[in-house]
């Protein structure tokens, strides 16, 4: 029975490890300067804020963030915005950058190796359960419910899972489960994903969320590190090993998702491509978004820079700036332009006579006068020249910028510098 005392005990004996060192290559130029979990999202957040907020809201106060690739932006964000836990009470958010801590002097070679190289630190914390999380997904989830499910089942490992369209499952680990939720098969990113029996168009995908009994995890990692034929990866190596030698159960996301509307389908997004990133941002600008950022019972925490309020002003000719289905953050100024279904991050300036639709503008973007922007992601610090048109001519867009097959255009400062004057 999940009494308050038992849930509190589960929270106090759990260590959460957030994996935040991946390159995020599918996001193209957006991750040339920063790791994927540090990418801005939803106007004022970073992607990693969702996993960290889930930890805090779930009552988990012992958290480690594993970093490696281009981590400066991420480390600065965590130091400025996530340093409020009290070490006196045994609470912490520790940063575990790659340090070549083990014999052999190599950097993190995979997700499992990243945890293994910090095994001495983990053992010193003495957790009973270890939650391993990907730091690059957008969702709200009560991890304590999943930990309680793990403890009650007696499994060695519990895997968070969600149903996805079968053809989308090529980007995930895919599971087979029996009627008791026991995982009987696991394959990482298959070219031809297996379907759920009786449902040929749907697959059961891993969410990249694992709960391990700590001692069992230690033995798995020590066994894996001595193996020759391994990628040192949880999805490719550790989970298949658990399925064959131990007990793994599947934990459906619906059992622990957090939603202000129980009738809405559970919201979980992998924003690993420009198209997915753009679409997930615009989801938030809809009239009633599936992901409720205004739920005060499950807040998403982040670093709060001190900025003046956003404002819409008339231009010198008296034209009023306006917008609808629009997220606007602090420090933004919109002068005599029309903006719809878009997300404007902090300190964005839009000059007069612009028409902007379905756009995601990251912080400190400046848009010159008389611009037309459609279906774009504008990277941090871009200065769009007066009269620029993006999103109307696919050929011109592809010549100047990074354009996806679905027509989303990513604009970066580097691309703007290469444009003819």
Curated annotation (Swiss-Prot):
Report the pathway entry. Answer: Glycan biosynthesis; glycogen biosynthesis
| Main EC class the enzyme belongs to | transferase
Q: Which Pfam families match?
A: Hexapep_GlmU (PF24894), NTP_transferase (PF00483)
Mind listing the GO molecular function terms for this protein? ATP binding; glucose-1-phosphate adenylyltransferase activity
Question: Is Transmembrane among the key words of this record?
Answer: no
Query: Which residues make up the binding site for alpha-D-glucose 1-phosphate?
Result: 108, 173, 188-189, 206
SUPFAM superfamilies tied to this protein: Nucleotide-diphospho-sugar transferases, Trimeric LpxA-like enzymes
Q: Which HAMAP family match?
A: GlgC (MF_00624)
Family under the similarity heading: Belongs to the bacterial/plant glucose-1-phosphate adenylyltransferase family.
How is this protein organized at the quaternary level? Homotetramer.
Summarizing the function annotation, the protein's role is:
Involved in the biosynthesis of ADP-glucose, a building block required for the elongation reactions to produce glycogen. Catalyzes the reaction between ATP and alpha-D-glucose 1-phosphate (G1P) to produce pyrophosphate and ADP-Glc.
Protein name (Swiss-Prot/TrEMBL) = Glucose-1-phosphate adenylyltransferase
Q: What is this protein's gene name?
A: glgC
């Amino acid at each position: 029975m999940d009494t308050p005392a038992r849930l509190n005990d589960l929270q106090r004996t759990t260590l959460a490890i957030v994996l935040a060192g991946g390159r995020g290559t599918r996001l193209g130029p957006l991750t040339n300067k920063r790791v994927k979990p540090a990418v801005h999202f939803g106007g004022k957040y970073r992607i990693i804020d969702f996993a960290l907020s889930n930890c805090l809201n779930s009552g988990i106060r012992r958290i480690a963030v594993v970093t490696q690739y281009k981590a400066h932006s991420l480390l600065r964000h965590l130091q400025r915005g996530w340093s409020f836990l009290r070490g006196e009470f045994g609470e912490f958010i520790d940063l575990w950058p790659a340090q070549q801590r083990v014999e052999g002097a190599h950097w993190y070679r995979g997700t499992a190796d990243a945890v293994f190289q910090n095994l001495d630190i983990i053992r010193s914390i003495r957790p009973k359960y270890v939650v391993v999380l990907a730091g690059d997904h957008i969702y709200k989830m009560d991890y304590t419910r999943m930990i309680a499910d793990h403890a009650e089942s007696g499994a060695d490992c519990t895997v968070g899972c969600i149903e996805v369209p079968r053809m989308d499952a090529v980007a995930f680990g895919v599971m087979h489960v029996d009627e008791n939720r026991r995982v009987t098969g696991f394959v990482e990113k298959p070219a031809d994903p297996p379907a759920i029996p009786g449902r040929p168009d749907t697959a059961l995908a891993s969410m990249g969320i694992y709960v391990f009994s700590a001692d069992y995890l230690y033995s798995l990692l020590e066994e894996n590190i001595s193996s020759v034929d391994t990628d040192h990866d949880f999805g490719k190596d550790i989970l298949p090993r658990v399925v064959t030698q131990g007990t793994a159960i599947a934990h459906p996301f619906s059992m622990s998702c957090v939603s202000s509307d129980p009738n809405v389908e559970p919201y979980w997004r992998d924003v690993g491509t420009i198209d997915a990133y753009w679409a997930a941002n615009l989801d938030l600008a809809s009239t009633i978004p599936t992901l409720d950022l205004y739920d005060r019972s499950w807040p998403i925490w982040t670093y709060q820079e001190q900025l003046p309020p956003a404002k819409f002003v008339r231009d010198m000719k008296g034209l009023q700036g306006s917008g609808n289905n629009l997220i606007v953050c602090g420090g933004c100024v919109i002068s005599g332009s029309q903006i719809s279904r878009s997300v404007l991050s902090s300190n964005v300036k839009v000059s007069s006579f612009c028409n902007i639709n379905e756009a995601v503008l990251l912080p400190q973007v400046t848009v010159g006068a008389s611009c037309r922007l459609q279906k774009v992601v504008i990277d941090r610090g871009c200065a769009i020249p007066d009269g620029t048109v993006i999103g109307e001519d696919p050929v011109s867009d592809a010549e100047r910028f990074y354009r996806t097959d679905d027509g989303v255009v990513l604009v970066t400062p580097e691309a703007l510098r290469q444009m003819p004057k």
